[in-house]
Amino acid sequence: MHDHPDQEVPRRLEELPSFGGDIHVYHSAVATFYAPSDLCGTGGLRRELIRLTPSFYGHERRDTVFVVLDDSKDGMEGMEIGRVLLFFSFRYRRRDFSCALINWLVRDEEPDPDTGMWTVRLECDQRGQPTVEVIDLDTIARGAHLLPVYGSSKVPDNFSYHDALDSYNSFFVNHFIDHHAHEFITAS
């Protein structure tokens, strides 16, 4: 799916483009999207804040997002999930670039037969390290709500939801969080 691990990298630093400008870092981004069954607001347009903060109520917060990879495909067939590590922008050759650094979460081939929800897990490279990629901010459609696949063991009493994305191996993509998410994810 992602060709970045196999992509040929220039052998010498001199072959890379030179950049000496400023890089601006942000702790949030706003996703604006059309929710066809929600005509409140401006003709069905909705806004959603995607957070990436070092301290949100005393804990780090790194939201997950839907990344559109192929807009010719419906629902999850054309998207993947990413966990935002960094929002940043820069200017290069008189052009502005707004980007996000993300960890990819790859989905299973089919939704879970018991819940009807897609499941995702952190994508890792050949060494077991999470993959990261810089993407254009415009490819982020909206925030994604993930639920841990708990398994059969008991969740510890002192477990905090702040640690869920770092503590579980796989997650359900919750299309029941709101009616737009349901339409958006299950579109066919």
Q: Could you describe each region identified by the protein language model?
A:
Residues 1-188:
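Terminal interaction-prone segments of large eukaryotic proteins
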